[in-house]
């Protein structure tokens, strides 16, 4: 998923969601990386992906009762991904699906502390602490090799 505003069109907004070991909250990974950065061009499973570009079979969506309207603004996408995983399915990021997204374009750019606290509290109360994505921590201090010097296979 690429940023939709002019000047940002060649930078990644989202290539999966991780649970950061520092605050136990979901975060986009690889934000602001270059479009063809090798680490953003690997299909892989995650705990969650963004709702800004999410595909799910209708039958599964209905079976897990879709998005939860108890969330005010944030984390509905993470919640639905957790429900998908709890139902025994994988949550997969693929670099082969490309979209441009103007984050906050309809709801506004900022989220109040009250909204964030409500939605984060709901997510944590409902799902508890999720396992860290062991190889995908935001500070990159663990696991993933630095692949920036590796050329992508663009056949």
Regions found by a protein language model. Name each.
Residues 1-64, 78, 87, 98-117, ...:
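Acidic/His-rich active-site region of diverse nucleotide-sugar glycosyltransferases
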Residues 73-74:
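A short, glycine-/small-residue-rich helix N-cap motif at loop->alpha-helix starts
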Residues 90:
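Residue-level detector of anion-binding/catalytic polar loops
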Residues 96, 109-134:
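Catalytic core of nucleotide-sugar-dependent glycosyltransferases
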Residues 120, 127-154:
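C-terminal accessory regions of radical SAM enzymes
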């Amino acid at each position: 998923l690429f940023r939709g505003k002019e000047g940002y069109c060649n930078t990644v907004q989202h290539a999966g969601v991780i649970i950061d070991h520092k605050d136990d909250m979901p975060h986009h990974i690889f934000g602001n990386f270059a479009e063809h950065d090798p680490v953003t061009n690997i299909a892989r499973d995650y705990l969650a992906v963004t709702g800004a570009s999410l595909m799910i079979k209708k039958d599964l969506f209905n079976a897990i009762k879709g998005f939860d309207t108890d969330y005010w603004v944030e984390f509905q996408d993470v919640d639905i991904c957790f429900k998908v995983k709890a139902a025994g399915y994988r949550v997969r990021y693929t670099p082969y699906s490309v979209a441009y997204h103007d984050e906050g374009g309809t709801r506004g750019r900022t989220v109040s502390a009250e909204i964030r606290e409500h939605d984060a509290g709901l997510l944590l109360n409902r799902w508890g602490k999720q396992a860290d994505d062991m190889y995908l921590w935001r500070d990159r201090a663990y696991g993933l090799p630095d692949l920036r010097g590796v050329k992508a296979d663009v056949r």
